[in-house]
Amino acid sequence: MIRKEMIAMLLAGGQGSRLGVLTKNVAKPAVLYGGKYRIIDFSLSNCTNSGIDTVGVLTQYQPLKLNAHIGIGKPWDMDRIDGGVTILSPYLKAEMGEWFKGTANAVYQNIQYIDKYSPHYVIILSGDHIYKMDYSKMLDFHKENHADATISVINVPYEEASRYGIMNCHENGKIYEFEEKPKNPKSTLASMGVYIFTWSTLREYLIKDNECSDSVNDFGKNIIPAMLGDGKSMWAYQYSGYWRDVGTIQAFWESNMDLVSRVPQFNLFDPEWRIYTPNPVKPAHYIASSACVKKSIIAEGCSVHGTVINSILFPGAYIEEGAVIQDSIIMSNSRVCKNAYINRSIISEQAIIGEKARLGEGPDVPNEYKPGIYDSGITVVGEKSSIPADAVIGKNVMIDIGASAVDFTSLNVQSGKSVFKGGVAE
């Protein structure tokens, strides 16, 4: 029997619907971030840097890019015979088989995988947060308190606390109450979605939860309240570093912009805590004499002939002469043609912005199609789409994946409008 002290179960099956067109064809953890990474790289790198060498990645929604990205885990030193990284998708069994119904059910369906390593502890992680954390220190805290469960928490502003699961604790950190998105929170200690459980205890509760017909099979809504109700030893591990849930267009854009601030809140260049990812086979970036670059991240394989200010260019982005990019994210292998102007926009992979096109101008009007998603003044262009020359695109505009010139009924797309491939929303 292979014995591991602690293994990780990384939840990476979420759609991330609040990211709109960015997650239409890809799971949220596989969305590009920070000039060369995908969001899941941060949790995987935390595991590597914390000495965790066995990780089960639980996938479900649109897993193709995520699976290809992780591969056999080599960038994270997880291409191992004993342990390493394993992709765990829903599958049919002789007696049953179904989609993961919730976070707890996803882990329950993989009890056999966990039992294979007979761990003392299991850490449950979300694959869609941006942060750097040493899980070994959290494990030490768990052991010192003889805990059944330890939940990592972070202080959030009071006005934002109702968006999170809130832990109410004694002064020593022992949890006495958990509130899921309370209207009137009693504290500001928000769950980060990072849990360490003593495996024998968690295993028992997963089985009980699966047998409960009215459970939604969720850690926050079912497992944690059940353990608290039974008087289990549960502790809050307070984290004080950078942590972002990039689950909305605004949060995603702001977190990327944090990387190019004068003094970045989140340091990607820390040699003591590297963020690992598969490296693209591309040459060094090229900055032409006609270019002007200020406060920006320029990845491998980029060619810059225009102006780039306070922006992020992913590998293979091509910025032609006269083009101006400001406060924007240009993802891999996209091209911005001559004299185009882009402001406060997210341009997905392999998109083309035509000559003299202008994006991100006009009044800040919420999107008519999905006002709760595109409402922060940021225009989003889907992958493999093409913006025609001379087009003027307003704020909070959504350009669908694969949209082209034939899908534009007008070259003037006003703020809050959308352009769909084929002209019709799916």
UniProtKB/Swiss-Prot annotation:
Protein name: Glucose-1-phosphate adenylyltransferase
UniProt-listed PANTHER family: GLUCOSE-1-PHOSPHATE ADENYLYLTRANSFERASE, GLUCOSE-1-PHOSPHATE ADENYLYLTRANSFERASE-RELATED
Pathway: Glycan biosynthesis; glycogen biosynthesis
EC number: 2.7.7.27
Biological classification of the source: Bacteria, Bacillati, Bacillota, Clostridia, Eubacteriales
Origin superkingdom: Bacteria
EC top class named in words: transferase
InterPro entries: ADP-Glc_PPase, ADP_Glu_pyroP_CS, GlgC_bac, GlmU/GlgC-like_hexapep, NTP_transferase_dom, Nucleotide-diphossugar_trans, Trimer_LpxA-like_sf
GO molecular function, one term: ATP binding
